[in-house]
A protein has these predicted regions:
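Terminal amphipathic alpha-helical/low-complexity segments used for targeting or macromolecular assembly
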Residues: 1-8, 13-14, 19-20, 56, ...
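Structural signal for interior beta-strand "rungs" in well-ordered beta-sheet cores
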Residues: 3-189
């Protein structure tokens, strides 16, 4: 089915628009843009040069996709934003393209970006992540699959967040947050394994215990991170999730967060139960 493009939208004839899209009035789409099938672009959205968008995406009022990077190193490079399928990009979200020639900001599939979220240049995001209201992700970050950011989280540049992690509202962090955990506070700290979300992701009880044991060695032991990793290899049964933890810890360049007090950890655990239902 042919796409429906409002005559009040400003869509470049050079832009490539897929089938069965709906583009509302006052949308602005530049020349070097590709949009897949079955996308809905609501009024007052701007989609800028270098944007490559898959199918089934919804972009809401006031969002800017493919904005020039807010980086002093940007000198007009031919860079991109690459977006997968079935993402929801809500009102006033900004996604910057890469800084250097060929650079890419990447958003995978089935992600939900709430109002006012900002994804900066060259950040790579996996699938099924949630970004709460006003969350700000700085440049060159790497974010795994199934990560939940609560409201107004600020992630500093070149940090990483592992799969199925959850981050408390209002948290600002500049160190890596490993997979399968709850984290939050100021400064950000470890609050325990993210058991509710792991269970929702069909990770069995035995594996969840292995994850908990691995992080007990990392966050409750009296050894260095290097020694804790070796203890995980020696003491925790192997499996995909444990290997994911080991690889994440071994490749951390910014360092990882530390342990949180029990009272705050209890609050974050209750938040995790809430998000597992959405």
């Amino acid at each position: 089915m042919a796409s429906i493009i409002s005559p009040k939208a400003e869509v470049s004839p050079k832009a490539k628009i897929g089938d069965n899209c709906k583009i509302y009035p006052f949308v602005y789409i530049e020349d070097d843009v590709e949009i897949g099938d079955n996308c809905v672009i609501y009024p007052f959205v701007s989609i800028m040069n270098g944007t490559r968008m898959g199918s089934g995406n919804k972009v809401f009022q006031g969002a800017v996709v493919g904005a020039l990077p807010q980086d002093f190193n940007f000198k007009g490079a031919n860079s991109f934003v690459v977006i997968g399928d079935n993402n929801t990009i809500r009102e006033n979200v900004v996604i910057n393209r890469g800084t250097y020639d060929g650079g890419k900001t990447v958003l995978g599939n089935n992600n939900f970006l709430m109002e006012g979220a900002h994804i900066s240049h060259d950040t790579v995001i996996g699938n099924r992540c949630v970004f709460g209201y006003g969350t700000k992700i700085a440049g060159d970050c790497v974010i795994g699959n199934g990560v939940i950011y609560s409201t107004s989280v600020v992630e500093n540049a070149k940090t990483r967040v592992g799969d199925l992690a959850m981050i408390q509202a209002g948290t600002t962090f500049s160190k890596d947050i490993p997979p399968y955990i709850i984290a939050g506070g100021k400064p950000v700290k470890y609050a325990g394994p993210n058991n509710i979300i792991m269970e929702a992701a069909n990770i069995g009880e035995k594996v969840r215990k292995h994850v908990a044991n691995a992080y007990r060695l990392v966050f409750h032991g009296q050894t260095s991170l290097f020694d804790a990793i070796n203890q995980i290899k020696d003491q925790v049964p192997d499996g995909a999730e444990v290997q994911n933890i080991i690889h994440f810890l071994e490749t951390s360049e910014k360092g990882v967060i530390t342990k949180m007090k029990d009272a705050v950890a209890s609050i974050l655990s209750r938040q995790s139960k809430f998000f597992s239902k959405i």
